[in-house]
A protein has these predicted regions:
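Structural motif
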Residues: 320-322, 350
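Accessory nucleic acid-recognition modules appended to NTPase machines
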Residues: 133, 140, 145-311, 315-318
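Short glycine-/polar-rich loops that comprise or flank the Walker A/P-loop
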Residues: 39-41, 78-83, 298, 347-350
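Domain-level recognition of nuclease-like catalytic cores that cleave nucleotide substrates
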Residues: 358-404
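Conserved P-loop NTPase "ATPase switch" module shared by AAA+ and STAND
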Residues: 1, 8-22, 26-28
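Catalytic cores of nucleic-acid endonucleases
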Residues: 328-371
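Interdomain motor-coupling "hinge/lid" segment immediately C-terminal to the ATP-binding subdomain
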Residues: 47, 53-195
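Conserved catalytic/switch belt of AAA+ P-loop NTPases
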Residues: 28-51
Length: 404
């Protein structure tokens, strides 16, 4: 590792140049195009999401959000020279790898999903056990390492207590003074927002008398830091999900399931591992589904009407809008049943329900064990366009003109 007056960097002969915390050192960033054109080295530059989202130091050395397009001014990298790759905590599949689950085992799960056949009993039981461990621990590498190396949930608690302190410290360090108390209030309110029967995020539940005008920038800061993620209400059950979303009606989930569990404190991890989830189990397993979708790079949507009709999540799956219901145990929500009875009204052909099941199908409803969430293929459908034969069009044009 080498240091200069500007930045810390590491020169790797086989890889290239690694720059740490790139947004703390804006001036050398302008050299990226020159090094790229030179062709001898690749550059890997790390930085926080706050930097990527345009939060930077102003002339008073305070962190502020700058207008889009002016994030770094003359210190920005020209378009075409930079590819931003967002990193996430471990998802459940990566957690399985960390627990020495090999591809043969995962391929059995994939086969059972594709063929819609039950998972063999021994594998099914083991996967449920590992899923509950993932819910209790989350995907932060330090927490997963503590579990793998010691098997001691007390060590996992210590890691998460430290992480929560660091997150709250960053809220003070990198935010405007006027936003600091509001950011913490929004963050601390997440568990009680999810504990409500109606999980719509309500500003009045952040603090007594709270209003969006005071907190909306603070909630945006938390989302830009990838601490939380909003799940927007869609006014119809159809595509495109983004186009049908209602901007000011949303739920809020933590970006990693382990963070929500850590915020609940006490004996929550032990309760999860023992199956004693109590009244909060619905919120935990909804957040687990959000965790899965977030780490697949998906935006979050749900459906709710004033009548109380609600679907936990809406996803684009195999070219269709598909509702997802998430249950900690074996049950089915009334709303899910109502919409299944009226497919012509809601335009829904297929439904997916995750819960304490093995793989099964009941007509339009695919029931899956919760541990299979990570297997959903949410990549955009591949569209290959036919080549237009311009030579043939030219021939046709000439024939047409010759007739005139």
């Amino acid at each position: 590792m080498q240091e200069s007056g500007y930045l810390r960097f590491q020169l790797l002969q086989e890889v290239g140049i690694v720059i740490l915390q790139r947004y703390n050192f804006p001036h050398p960033i302008t050299c990226f195009p020159c090094v790229n054109d030179d062709g001898r080295y690749d550059i890997i530059a790390t930085g926080s999401l706050l930097g990527v989202q345009g939060y930077g130091q102003d002339e008073k050395k305070q962190w502020t959000r700058k207008p889009i397009g002016q994030e770094r001014g003359s210190n920005s990298v020209p378009v075409g020279y930079e590819q931003i790759v967002e990193m996430y905590p471990l998802d459940f599949e990566e957690f399985l790898w960390a627990n020495n689950m090999n591809e043969e085992i995962i391929n059995v799960l994939k086969h059972c999903l594709e063929e819609e056949t039950p998972v063999p009993s021994g594998i099914h039981v083991a996967m449920k056990t590992l899923l509950y461990r993932y819910v209790a621990v989350g995907g932060m590498p330090a927490a997963v390492n503590a579990l793998i190396e010691t098997g001691n949930m007390g060590k996992v608690n210590d890691v998460w207590n430290s992480l929560l302190k660091e997150y709250r410290s960053d809220m003070v360090k990198y935010a405007d003074d006027k936003d600091k108390p509001h950011i913490r209030a929004c963050f601390n309110a997440v568990p009680k927002q999810l504990a409500k029967e109606n999980k719509k995020y309500q500003w009045s539940k952040v603090e007594s008398g709270g209003r969006g005008v005071y907190y909306k920038d603070s909630l945006q800061w938390l989302e830009d830091a990838d601490i939380i993620r909003r799940c927007y209400n869609s006014n119809i059950t159809g595509l495109p999900l983004e186009g049908n979303a209602i901007d000011n009606v949303f739920k809020v989930y933590t970006a990693d399931i382990g963070m929500l569990v850590a915020m609940l404190g006490g004996t929550t991890r032990a309760d999860i591992l023992q199956g004693n989830l109590g009244g909060f189990k619905g919120a935990i397993f909804e957040n687990l589904m959000a965790d899965t979708l977030i780490k697949k790079g998906q935006s979050l949507y749900y459906f709710q009407k004033d009548s109380g009709l609600e679907l936990d999540f809406l996803i684009r799956y195999k070219g269709e809008c598909v509702p997802i219901e998430v249950k900690a145990k074996s049950a089915q929500a009334k709303s899910f049943s109502t919409i299944r009875k009226h497919p012509e009204k809601y335009g829904i052909k297929h439904f997916i329900k995750f819960g304490d099941y093995n793989v099964g199908r009941d007509g339009d409803l695919l029931t899956l064990p919760t541990y299979m969430q990570f297997l959903l293929d949410l990549e955009p459908e591949e569209v290959i366009l036919e080549t237009i034969d311009t030579d043939e069009l030219t021939r046709m044009a000439r024939e047409f003109l010759d007739q005139k």
